[in-house]
Amino acid sequence: MRYRNYLQTKLDGVPVDGTKLPSGFQIVGHVALVHLDEKLWQYAYQIGELTMEYNRRVKSVAIRYGPTEGVTRKPAYKVVAGDLNTVTMFTEAGIRFMLDPLVVTFSRGNRQERMRLSSIVRPGEIVVDMFACVGQFALPIAIGESSRVFAIEIDPIAYDFLLRNIELNKLESKVVAILGDCRDVHPLAVADRVIMGYLHDTSAYLPAALETLSRKGGTVHMHIASPLKAIASLRDVISSKAAEKGFRANTVTRRIKTYSPGVEHLAFDIRLMPS
């Protein structure tokens, strides 16, 4: 039975609008993350308990009460049912992760993009991840044949989980973790490939990404949340900033998924050559 139908059946007799019930939830380890309409918050505990009944792997249920905030990308969830301890461990594509999804952002929905990037990195490449978080891009890449990954993270809590995950996966010799703002602490002129997995005003960080790129050129993968109608202007910004740093840019745009009404999660794959 589908999740929404399950909730409707179990909440029979409770005055809720079935169309406002969530159609699904994200599982991170033992934690279920639920987007619940504000009008249903008074039933959050019941829905949380039913979510654990629906999926026996779930031991904690948290609802979203606001948007992800700030440069540290702090999510806004609170536990409404189950275990209050939301530090969890799980394996994705052979990589072991430890994190707290109520404290750091980890989207299981971006798994395909993480796997795509790890598959296109060539042996011997040096990769810089500008927004590493707990290592969701950096570690799948490092476990392959790339020579080294520099993983930069501004949030001390996410950075601590990043260090733990590097150790869990025995990647100490391949991943260099750096704590700080990527605009201030990025390595210079070393990278064959740069990953920018931050969605908000990402183009403002592009000059730093171009500075970390090898002078012989390479590829920048820039993610951003934007309306589709802004693609042309974003491509112009990319070309302009590349020219300022001595590069010519050849850009391919991909849609990853819908981010919010009218806004898409876009990826710009930017191939850069010396001008």
Language model feature labels by segment:
Residues M1-S275:
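SAM-dependent transferase fold signal centered on methyltransferase-like domains
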